[in-house]
């Protein structure tokens, strides 16, 4: 029988919530084999047109500083086929809070790679996609079956699949659902979906611990990228109107600002932008915001709300990105929160429930209904995540350069 150990207490009006640990963390091989025999992956498809792209593919590698990654022959070659993002920053250390941020718009104080579960009243990008029936899926290399929730696989020996590199499995609003876990699949299903033209419009792809450079090095990861991504970019079904982001969860040196090598490729990139660079300040939160702006989706009301949009998307919406002075930006630690080991706080951050946000479509109804009447914990309109209590990134300077034809009086 599965048992749950309560880690945190939920007090609804104060936005306090629960985190739980279950025996799903360490299933037996027999339990895995039994589940694998019956687990059915689910591959919904949709065709919702976007402003700048119709499909987004997010591929993450691991733990490499900008400079070594930029020197890798395979990565630098691919970057020249698209747009090199020279000021893309990860959010924190270690790995797991970055993956969490990519799905939930926040780290919730996470500063560890423990087996954590985020309560079901916290929304994710899955909720945003569902507002317009946009298909989504994750593809995790070497995960034993769709919806697997164990901490790792195989159970012994070298790591291959690890839960900490799987964004949506961290959220109970996903894992407690009857269908959503089946959309978190392995690479076998990826190639099946590719063959049968049943890939979703949003994909998050995680190679195993060998291929992502975590347990090896950037040369191994670069070789994997060449084997995996280069053929896909020649596949018309995969690449047509698709935008592919290749980035890293975090840098390797914790004392560095956490700028990570990132580039965009794919059929959605106009010819005149191929082989160019983009110096705009971006974070992992920028991707959540850009997805919302591209498809006309609401915001999570968290750090995605004020995040800069990918320039390709901003140019389509008319949004003016912030110019950020990155000389003192150090996105290498998190703030107090219920997921923190070193700076624990029982209070969960309250998101914004008002405002248009950078994507321009307001806050998701599920977020507004959950947190109605509560004051947001942070200044989520800022393009730079900062925390006054801990002093993280307080005082970072940013400004906008507005070009107005007639009048700027209506611009805020």
Swiss-Prot record:
EC number: 3.1.3.2
GO CC annotation: extracellular region
Annotated active site: 215 (proton donor)
Secretion signal span: 1-19
Keywords for this protein: Glycoprotein, Hydrolase, Secreted, Signal
Glycosylation sites: 74, 121, 186, 208, 217, 332, 343
Short name of any one Pfam family annotated for the protein: Phosphoesterase
Matching InterPro entries: Alkaline_phosphatase_core_sf, Phosphoesterase
GO biological process, one term: phospholipid catabolic process
UniProt KW Secreted keyword: yes
Post-translational modification as stated in the protein's UniProt record: The N-terminus is blocked.
UniProt-annotated location(s): Secreted
Catalytic activity: a phosphate monoester + H2O = an alcohol + phosphate
Any GO molecular function: acid phosphatase activity
Top-level taxon of the source organism: Eukaryota
Ranges that cross the membrane: none
Gene3D superfamilies: Alkaline Phosphatase, subunit A (3.40.720.10)
Name recorded for this polypeptide: Phosphate-repressible acid phosphatase
Taxonomic source organism: Penicillium chrysogenum (Penicillium notatum)
């Amino acid at each position: 029988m599965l048992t749950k150990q309560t880690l945190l207490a939920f007090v609804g009006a104060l936005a306090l919530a629960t985190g739980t640990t279950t025996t799903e963390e360490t299933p037996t091989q027999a339990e895995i084999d039994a589940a694998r025999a019956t687990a059915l992956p689910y591959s919904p498809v949709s065709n919702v047109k976007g402003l700048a792209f119709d499909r987004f593919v997010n591929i993450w590698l691991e733990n490499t500083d900008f400079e070594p990654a930029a020197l890798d022959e395979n990565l630098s070659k691919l970057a020249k086929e698209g747009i090199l993002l020279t000021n893309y920053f990860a959010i924190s250390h270690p790995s797991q809070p970055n993956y969490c941020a990519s799905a939930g718009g926040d780290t919730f104080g996470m500063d560890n790679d423990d087996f954590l579960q985020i309560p079901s009243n916290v929304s994710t990008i899955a909720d945003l996609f569902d507002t317009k029936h946009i298909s989504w899926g994750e593809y995790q290399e070497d995960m034993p079956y769709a919806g697997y929730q164990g901490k790792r696989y195989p159970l012994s020996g070298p790591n291959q699949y690890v839960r900490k590199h799987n964004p949506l499995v961290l959220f109970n609003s996903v894992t407690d659902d009857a269908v959503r876990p089946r959309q978190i699949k392995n690479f076998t299903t990826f190639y099946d979906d590719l063959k049968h033209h049943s890939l979703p419009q949003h994909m998050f792809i995680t190679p195993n611990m060998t291929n992502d450079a975590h347990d090896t090095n950037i040369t191994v990861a670069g070789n994997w990228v060449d084997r995996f991504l280069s053929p896909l970019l020649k596949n018309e079904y995969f690449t047509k109107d698709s935008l592919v982001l290749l980035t890293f969860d975090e840098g390797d040196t914790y004392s560095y600002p956490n700028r990570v090598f990132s580039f965009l490729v794919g059929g959605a990139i106009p010819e005149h932008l191929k082989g160019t660079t983009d110096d705009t300040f971006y974070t992992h939160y920028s991707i959540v915001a850009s997805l919302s702006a591209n498809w006309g989706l609401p915001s999570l009301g968290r750090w995605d709300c004020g995040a800069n949009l990918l320039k390709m998307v901003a140019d389509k919406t008319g949004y003016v990105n912030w110019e950020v002075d990155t000389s003192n930006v150090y996105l290498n630690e998190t703030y107090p929160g219920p997921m923190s080991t070193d700076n624990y706080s029982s209070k969960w951050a309250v998101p914004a429930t008002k405002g248009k946000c950078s994507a321009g479509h307001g806050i998701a109804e599920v977020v507004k209904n959950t947190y109605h009447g509560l004051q947001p914990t942070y200044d989520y309109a800022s393009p730079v995540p900062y925390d006054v209590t801990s002093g993280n990134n307080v005082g970072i300077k940013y400004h906008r350069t507005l070009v107005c034809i007639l009048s700027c009086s209506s611009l805020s």
